[in-house]
Amino acid sequence: MIQQETRLKVADNSGAREVLTIKVLGGSGRKTANIGDVIVCTVKQATPGGVVKKGEVVKAVIVRSKSGARRKDGSYIRFDENAAVIIRDDKSPRGTRIFGPVARELRDAQFMKIVSLAPEVL
């Protein structure tokens, strides 16, 4: 589960390396987010010359989570790290490449561009 103040690795080439969660979107009192949920973040580490700069406030979608997610068939998907992809307001990624596997739950959440760019969908 991702909550406020959680640090996540960035799984794209937008220029950010690490982000810190400011807010979980979707509901007035919502505390936690999981795979496929949109969060508001601030960039804590960034590469020089990237599209995104340090200190910038961005929206991101969670693509990998340590806590995992339960699927309809009863199985669970769990990853070794918490990772997110920085997105625009129209749900398209700001970077042009996605690094590492992403969960199949992103397809249900209408993030088809991220799913098509990912090297592996689990």
UniProtKB/Swiss-Prot annotation:
SMART domains: Ribosomal_L14 (SM01374). Keywords: Ribonucleoprotein, Ribosomal protein, RNA-binding, rRNA-binding. Coiled coil: none annotated. Gene3D superfamilies: Ribosomal protein L14. One of its GO terms (biological process) is translation. One of its GO terms (molecular function) is structural constituent of ribosome. Transmembrane segments: none annotated. GO terms for cellular component: cytosolic large ribosomal subunit. It holds the Pfam family Ribosomal_L14. InterPro entries: Ribosomal_uL14, Ribosomal_uL14_bac-type, Ribosomal_uL14_CS, Ribosomal_uL14_sf. The keyword Ribosomal protein applies. PROSITE patterns: RIBOSOMAL_L14. The keyword Cell membrane does not apply. Part of the 50S ribosomal subunit. Forms a cluster with proteins L3 and L19. In the 70S ribosome, L14 and L19 interact and together make contacts with the 16S rRNA in bridges B5 and B8. Belongs to the universal ribosomal protein uL14 family. Binds to 23S rRNA. Forms part of two intersubunit bridges in the 70S ribosome. This is Large ribosomal subunit protein uL14. It comes from Oceanobacillus iheyensis (strain DSM 14371 / CIP 107618 / JCM 11309 / KCTC 3954 / HTE831).
